[in-house]
């Protein structure tokens, strides 16, 4: 028959050994809770920063991730006091805390994977000059006001033009107005376009990573001089590339 705790004489070697074991278990529990808390805090801070950065592009996380991959943000801090001497309640609290931290870390991993496929880089990594922005401008050929659904960057002739996120090449050839142009599908509704290239260095169907070379800067098509015309398209609609490039500076610095 197992001996009850109440039957063990106070001050006996057995009682001392049990007390030491309980103290060790309590200390271990406290250390685990502290580690979980630190993990959750770091993940929450990084997740919060990435959400703010994505918001600066004009999009929210709910636009980009399925609901199943977004942690329940209602899960906040607080709750009843649970005495660690009651290990049954303490164990329950530990598993609840671990589950909450796990949800947040899973969401962070999903967001960081998503970031790899959002065009947040610049199409030129060499020294360049911004020459024309997104929106209404005076057309350089006709002098009339017209929409410009991209950004223009000038640089040295044949400078490498690079992919602004991982993706798959869906077009590599000539288009009216664009000259030699490359289009990349990044998934999640994002497509980027690189126009007026001197030379194309990728083929349709090719997978590319961020900053992989897709062509060389040139002046083909409707162009007044060497530059790359760069577009960001989300679900078929043009977006201002500047917002994505500026957001990317914070992502890659982080």
Language model regions located:
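Non-catalytic extracellular/periplasmic "stalk"
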Residues: 1-129, 133
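Catalytic cores of peptidoglycan-degrading enzymes
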Residues: 108, 117-254
């Amino acid at each position: 028959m197992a001996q009850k705790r109440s039957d063990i004489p106070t001050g006996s070697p057995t009682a001392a050994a049990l007390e030491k074991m309980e103290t060790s278990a309590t200390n271990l529990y406290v250390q685990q809770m502290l580690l979980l808390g630190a993990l959750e805090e770091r993940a929450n801070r990084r997740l919060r920063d990435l959400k703010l950065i994505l918001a600066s592009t004009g999009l929210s996380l709910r636009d980009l991730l399925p609901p199943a991959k977004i942690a329940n943000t209602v899960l906040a801090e607080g709750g009843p006091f649970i005495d660690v001497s009651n290990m049954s309640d303490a164990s329950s609290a530990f598993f609840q805390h671990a589950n909450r931290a796990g949800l947040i870390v899973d969401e962070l991993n999903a967001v960081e994977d998503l970031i790899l496929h959002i065009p947040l880089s610049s199409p030129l990594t060499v020294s360049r000059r911004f020459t024309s922005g997104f929106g209404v401008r005076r057309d350089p050929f006709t002098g009339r006001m017209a929409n410009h659904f991209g950004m223009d960057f000038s640089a040295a002739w044949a400078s490498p033009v690079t992919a602004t996120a991982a993706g798959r090449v869906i077009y590599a050839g000539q288009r009216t107005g664009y000259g030699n142009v490359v289009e990349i599908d990044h998934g999640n509704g994002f497509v980027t376009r690189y126009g007026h290239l001197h030379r194309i260095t990728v083929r349709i169907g090719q997978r590319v990573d961020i900053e992989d070379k897709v062509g060389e800067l040139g002046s083909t098509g409707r162009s007044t001089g060497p530059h790359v015309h760069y577009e960001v398209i989300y679900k078929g609609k043009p977006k201002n590339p500047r917002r994505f490039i500026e957001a990317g500076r914070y992502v890659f610095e982080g």
